[in-house]
Each structure stands twice: as C-alpha cells, then as structure tokens.
Amino acid sequence: MPKRTDIKSILILGAGPIVIGQACEFDYSGAQACKALREEGYRVILVNSNPATIMTDPEMADATYIEPIHWEVVRKIIEKERPDAVLPTMGGQTALNCALELERQGVLEEFGVTMIGATADAIDKAEDRRRFDVAMKKIGLETARSGIAHTMEEALAVAADVGFPCIIRPSFTMGGSGGGIAYNREEFEEICARGLDLSPTKELLIDESLIGWKEYEMEVVRDKNDNCIIVCSIENFDAMGIHTGDSITVAPAQTLTDKEYQIMRNASMAVLREIGVETGGSNVQFAVNPKNGRLIVIEMNPRVSRSSALASKATGFPIAKVAAKLAVGYTLDELMNDITGGRTPASFEPSIDYVVTKIPRFNFEKFAGANDRLTTQMKSVGEVMAIGRTQQESLQKALRGLEVGATGFDPKVSLDDPEALTKIRRELKDAGAERIWYIADAFRAGLSVDGVFNLTNIDRWFLVQIEELVRLEEKVAEVGITGLNAEFLRQLKRKGFADARLAKLAGVREAEIRKLRDQYDLHPVYKRVDTCAAEFATDTAYMYSTYEEECEANPSTDREKIMVLGGGPNRIGQGIEFDYCCVHASLALREDGYETIMVNCNPETVSTDYDTSDRLYFEPVTLEDVLEIVRIEKPKGVIVQYGGQTPLKLARALEAAGVPVIGTSPDAIDRAEDRERFQHAVDRLKLKQPANATVTAIEMAVEKAKEIGYPLVVRPSYVLGGRAMEIVYDEADLRRYFQTAVSVSNDAPVLLDHFLDDAVEVDVDAICDGEMVLIGGIMEHIEQAGVHSGDSACSLPAYTLSQEIQDVMRQQVQKLAFELQVRGLMNVQFAVKNNEVYLIEVNPRAARTVPFVSKATGVPLAKVAARVMAGKSLAEQGVTKEVIPPYYSVKEVVLPFNKFPGVDPLLGPEMRSTGEVMGVGRTFAEAFAKAQLGSNSTMKKHGRALLSVREGDKERVVDLAAKLLKQGFELDATHGTAIVLGEAGINPRLVNKVHEGRPHIQDRIKNGEYTYIINTTSGRRAIEDSRVIRRSALQYKVHYDTTLNGGFATAMALNADATEKVISVQEMHAQIK
C-alpha cells in the first residue's frame, strides 16, 4: 500500500551530542531519513543539538532546530510547527527516551501527533526488561536467567538467586552505561549503585553470566504486511562478556551451520512480530552456548542502531532510508533498491560475496587511571571497517585502517622477555584494547589454537586464520626480499598483507616492496558492493580492493575528478567535525561539475554513504591504498586538509609520488607545524608569542625553563588533540614530565611555552584564496587559556572582547594567511592578556570548529574553501564579507568521564571531549543556558553552592559569590576562600577539606547538600588534593566548574530560561541576510 496521505509534516528526533555508545551513525541515519521523507513530499522538521552533523544543515530539512533534545524544548517546537507525526527511531536511545517522555507527559496527545516508525508500546516492550522477558517466553525463546531490581535490597536478593559472576544492565541506557560484570559482592554493590543512578526508570536487570558464549546479531527489516528480510548477519569475534560495540565483528556470520542460521533467522523475525515492530529496522542479539548449542535472546533494539549503520555499509542496503519509507506506510516490495538502479525491489534479501570486519578504536591513553579492560560497558570511541574477499584479507585491512601504529599483526611483546608468556596469557584472558595482537604473539610464542581458545573463548575457526598469517610472516622473515617471487608475493597480498608490514618482515623499506610489485605488475583490482553478489549489474560506484583477476572499477576518462581523503575511524581529537568537512567538499565540487571520489574506512559516517560522492572507495586511508586508487582514477586534485591528521600525515609522501595535492601545499602545512620554520615566519611578521623554546634533552629543558619562567605548557611537536601535553608548575614537575611522557616524541623535540595564566583564548576560522582573506568567525572561549580548545566552550560573536582587540586579530590572521600561502581553510588560536594579543598556533587546514561556525553564520565554510582549492576565488563565489550574526551561538562540549570512574575530570591541555552541542539565544546568557541543557548538564537555578578557589582567583571570586547570593544561593567555602569572602562582607559556611576532619566536602557532596560547585586549582599538589571534589561532583551529578570564567558564565545563565523560546536555523540565517 502506498504512503500515508493523512500526514503532511513529520518531526525527526536526532541523537544529540556524540558520546561513547552513540556516535555519528545517527547522523548517517538521520540524514538518510530527511532525504527519504522529503523525496516523498513530506514537510520535515528536525531537532538535534549537535551542530557538527550533516542532518542539521539548513538544506536537509524544511525547519531545523539546533536545540536541546529535552521534552520541554521539543514541546515548544511541536507547539510552533504542529507536525502530524514524530519519527523517533533515527536518533538512538536519546530520541527514544525523549519520545517516550513526550508520550508520558501527554504532549503527543495534546497536539495530536502520531508516533511513526515504532509505537510507544513497542519501544517500551523492547526496552523494559521484564516485559521483554515475558514476550520472549510467549514465543518460546529463552532469555538469560535474571531478575529485576529497583533498590539495592532487591538487587542483592536477585544476586543470591542468579549467583556470581553476574551481569548488571540498567534499563533505558545506551552503550551499556552504568552496567558491568560483578565477580563478587563488593563489585556488585558498586555497579548497582552506579546503575540505579544512571537508569531514568531506576531499574536494573541482573542476568546470569553468559561469559564465553558466542554472540551474534541479526539486522532485520519488517513492514506492516509482515514482509521480513534479514539485511545482514553479524558475528562477534569476541565472546560474550565484551559489549558488542567494543567487540571485533564480522559479517556475514562465519561459523554458523546453515541449519543454525535458519533457526536464528526465524527467531529474529518472531521477535519483531511479538514486539510489534512493523515499520522499520531492528537489531536482535543472540548468544549461543558453544558447548551444547543452547540459544538465548539477549536483547533487541526497536530502532536504527550502530549495527545497522555497519550492516548498511557492509551490504549497500540503506536501512535507515528504507525504514523511513516504511514508517510512512510503504511496504518492502513497493520500494526499489537504489544500488542496483531499481533492478531489484527492497524485499530482496541482500547477499554478499565478500567478508566485512569491524574493529573498534579506543582512546585509553587520554584517561590516566581509567580501567582499560573490556566489559559489558562500552568504552570505544570509534570504529574502522574493511572489506576483503577472505576473512584474512578483511581483518588485515581493518588492522592497518585503525591507525594505531600497526600495519598488520605487529608484535606487542618481545619473545626474549622472560615475562612474555605470562603477559600474553594475562592479555588473552582479561581482554584490553589490543588483544587481537596478543593472539598473534601467542602463536609466535608457541601456544596452540586450543591453548588460545581456552584463554579467550574465541571460535577456533578465527584463531586458525590468525595462526596461518603468523606462519606466513615467519616464512617472509626467513626468505627476505630475495625470496619474494611473483607467486609468493601474490599469495601474501591476497591475504591482506600491507607493503609496510612485508617490508618490516623482510628488513627493507616500504618503497622497495612497492617497486617489486611494479616489476611483477601486481596491483589490486576493485570490486563493487552491489547487495546481490554480482547477480545484477550495478551503476553505483561503491568499491573495495582485492587481489583477483577482474577489475570492476571502470573509471571514467572524460571528467575532471577530485579525490577527498577522509579521516578514518573516530577518536578523541578527530571526530565527526572532520567528516562533516569532507562531505561538504564532496557536495560542493559535485555541484560544480567535478566527479568526486571519497576514500574512507569509517562505517558510521555520512562520507561513506554511497550517494555522498560519485565514487566511494571503502579502503584504509594509508599511503599504499591511496596510491593504488590514484593509479587507476588519475584525479586532477586530491584534498588532504579536511580529514584531520590522518590524510595530512600522507601529504608529503603523496606529493613525492607525484600526486596533485591541491589547496595549501604540504610544504606550507609543514611551515606552520614545524616550530623553527614557524618561528621565522612569526618574527618576520613581528607578531607576539608567549616566550618559548624547543628542547631535545632534559637538562636543556631545565635551563630554558629558568629563562622562560613557570608555569609552562610542554608538548611534543606534531600532535592533534593535545596528546601528551601538560602544564607544569616547577622543576620537579618538569622532570617528571620528561620521564613519563616524552616517549611519544619519536626523536622529535619537545616544545616549551610560557603559560599565560588567566588569558582569554580565541579561535578564528578563515579562508584564503591567495588574493583575499575571509574571516569565518571569531570565537571567544569561556574556559581560560590552558584548557584545550577542543574541550572549551566558546561563543560567537565574542561576548567580552573589545572591537579593537578583535580587529588586531583580523589583521594578524590576514598577514599569516598570505605569509603561509594558504589556499583554503585555516584556523588561528590567540590568547589575550592585559589587552595584548599573543599568537598561540596556526593550523592551515579544516579545524573542528568549522561546522559550528557554518551553522552560526550561515556561511558553509567547508564548501566555500573546497571551491577555492579547486581554483574558484572568493570574489567569483560572491563570498567576501565576514558575517557577524545578530544573536549569540555557544558551543559546549560533552565529556565521557562517567564511563571512566577514577579519572580526574579536571580540564587541561589534553583533549578529552567526545562531542559538542550548540545553543542559540538573543543574549549570551540564553545561548549558554541552552548549550548547558543540551549537554545534559545538571545546572540548577538555586540551592547551596560550594566555592573553593586557588590563590590567583581569590580577588575575582568575591564578585562571583555576590552574583550567586543575588540568585538566591546559600554559600559554603573552604578555609582560604572563606577568609577572602569574609573580608568582603560575605559570610559563607566554612567546610573542611578532606584532610581537615569530618564532616568534610566529600561527605557533604554525598549527602546531596550542593547544587553547584566551583573548584579551581593550580600546582600538582593542589590538583591531587582537590581531585576527590571533582570526582564526587561528577558521581553525584552536581554541576561543577573548574575555571572561574566558567563560573561567571554559569552565573549569567542562571537568569536565562533555556526552554522558553525556540528558533530554527532557517529563521536564524534569515536574520543575517
């Protein structure tokens, strides 16, 4: 039956900021849903607080609200826009929870809005653990023995019944938040306390342990006529006990017999029928006991998920797009499959003739003190996917695409080490982020397949594959480059070995292996992802490489081509913002008539959607893989400045190989990154920088530090996201830094800068075309200098800086752009102290603020700059004036500390945020208040505030205290702060620090006495002492600031109402015109 005509407009709920467990896969699904529904003539209204998404671009929906995804705000949007229906299945757990809340609060009924895609009852039945268990029993499927608890007493009673170890999962949370595995009562109580706190319904499910069972997922799509298709089966390489988001996964499932697969297929369809999903996609997770084949249903998600993004990219079947059309009444047989050009209907189950491997990417090095063992709580921040003709090829391609310094199965331990075996065994038994490499080491150290299986419970079939690769590596090392004849080299390439790995094994340079392949004329061919295992011809150019006979790439020869290199897997410091830029480059150049080619390996993103570019190569972004694509495509230009450090690292090597890198030249990029070369440019332009030095040894650093003066910012050269960057306060601190952190330098020097305490930091994004410079936006940071710019909230326009100071910065940016010969985007960071402007750094590439600035000003910077790189001047594009909006936009960051108990949430020069939100208001205060609501802050309007500040903040704290009093807060202060306040006539209640006796600060936080805490520190001892305050504030959900500037912004926002007025991006941009 065709689409519904009783609904004319549809509200899509987005997923909000990127957090661990909910990443850019929902931008991909939301963007697809917007396109699909507008194609059908519906009016689409979108709400999503994350500005770094493609779906919040003004052309994606008819009305776009970058507002907090909070039921009261969404109610305002519904009241204003009057949609007929709401689609909550595209925005992850955030959207589902918001939709259920709108239903509970009677908002949907009040405005006559229907829920489409999933009914409130189906969502509740799938998410409510007790109802789900009952539903499964009804259709004869087993679930794990379990019980439900709402209090600690109930939880302990369930544990007595289920036994240890047991698995704890809170209801209605995402990415296993608050859950875990408890092996004893102490761990059990700790996990339950955290879980009860995080579950919006205060409900825990406590399961028998299925640790060591095999885990599978089925991606199912069902329509209202009960047509059901399995899009993809996915098998977890890691056994149960590790969250599926943290597991290596393989599609299609490799170790099921046909009979087992059919049983699981039928079971997953039965689950969708029973839960009542009849208009869209779901994923159903199963566990199988390898000893006896017992099958258990773990859970199902009645929405588009991380796995469905993976399944879409793995098969080419656009689940989100199809689900959106089913939600408005179509059936599967009425929809055509785009990839085959409509030669097959969407009711054909995809079949694939290749293997797909996904490996998660972790960032534990950013979180000192975090528990880096993998459990049922998700901890990975990104993922990489690779496609190959065999399991071995796809696994090795994924390993090199992960960008963790491995080009394949590089050894982790030296076999000469007497502790080697002990270490390998420990890593296999208790999995961390690197277990896959330790498995290869185990085979090198002489463990058998059974031996590894007993430690890991990973299916022997997978282990045999890895063992064979290790044996081949040993053979290469034995015969050397002279033994690599054409036949042997071909065999190795078919198994996915990278040139770089073979070079290391043979003891030669990578270029020599490449030369050898050229001699043998040994190059990959490209196959197409077509959903039908090559049964039907396909017009869609979605390719992967493999070493076989027939090439299906079929590149055009009549059009000018531009290739965009993507950013690879998400990680902290390089996330969705860079993908956003890549997508914009591709869209703009397509509009201008170029054929665009995208190279990337991140399955979550819009850039790897088959219709974002003319041609998509789903390949690792490494030198070898990129050069092979360039060899057959012969592009006119390659863009490396948009994908973060991943493609930038390749710029020089690509240029050396004769690849036309367009935009700012690799040499100019190097001039900005290399300290000494940059220093020459700065001196020539007579710009001010904080006193600094470059050192190569510890004693030299100690000498230079005396000249520059403490505190210092220390860091290795060439980093993104502030890796190994710290503020040190004295010589002892400096020596400690050199002993613990300088190993990251790879013979590169370490940079010392005088730290400008209390300076205001400013980010400026600009575009230069060689003739003029366009200022995109000037953003004033809210946290003072010293907090990494990626972790600081910022305001556009600036909210305290004078016009004169801003003009000085504009002039300096212009001088720098011409001096460095920038063609395209650049980002400059300044610090302002005592009305002096200091230059901090220049990045001649896309910065993570580009999407935010584009949304705030209505100027699509990434598109404009891409056209500049392709040779179209700013004047020709008609974009020559800086836009200063008549409203304020505030970007606030979202930090993942709740996933890492034990890590100090103090902000510093090392970036740790995973995502961002944006708030827009007529005043700075209103915009800041909205950004706080959007980032799930727990800011309250009144209550009791605790003030504990460092020496340098004591005079300014008086003003803040007065503002809080005026707002109706009662005040507490620690000893030193209380004295200063007392002298100013403010008398707070005195509280003890932790070492001063009880009741102390921590007791009072635990008792729920505070609604707001401000705690600023400097010096290592003070930071250690006050760490317990920050951890407790986080744990007990008290809004806290670790900078005084943050405190002042909070005080301003207390007067504003974040839920009072909503404004769409289209209305914002209309005010600028």
Curated annotation (Swiss-Prot):
InterPro entries: ATP-grasp (IPR011761), CarbamoylP_synth_lsu (IPR006275), CarbamoylP_synth_lsu_oligo (IPR005480), CarbamoylP_synth_lsu_oligo_sf (IPR036897), CbamoylP_synth_lsu-like_ATP-bd (IPR005479), CbamoylP_synth_lsu_CPSase_dom (IPR005483), MGS-like_dom (IPR011607), MGS-like_dom_sf (IPR036914). Pathway: Amino-acid biosynthesis; L-arginine biosynthesis; carbamoyl phosphate from bicarbonate: step 1/1; Pyrimidine metabolism; UMP biosynthesis via de novo pathway; (S)-dihydroorotate from bicarbonate: step 1/3. This is Carbamoyl phosphate synthase large chain. Mg(2+) 2 binds at residues 299, 301. It catalyses: hydrogencarbonate + L-glutamine + 2 ATP + H2O = carbamoyl phosphate + L-glutamate + 2 ADP + phosphate + 2 H(+). GO terms for biological process: 'de novo' UMP biosynthetic process; glutamine metabolic process; L-arginine biosynthetic process. Mn(2+) 4 binds at residues 841, 843. Its cofactor is Mg(2+); Mn(2+). Mn(2+) 3 binds at residues 829, 841. Residues 2-403 are annotated as: Carboxyphosphate synthetic domain. ATP 1 binds at residues 129, 169, 175-176, 208, 210, 215, 241-243, 285, 299. Composed of two chains; the small (or glutamine) chain promotes the hydrolysis of glutamine to ammonia, which is used by the large (or ammonia) chain to synthesize carbamoyl phosphate. Tetramer of heterodimers (alpha,beta)4. Mn(2+) 2 binds at residues 299, 301. It comes from Escherichia coli O157:H7.
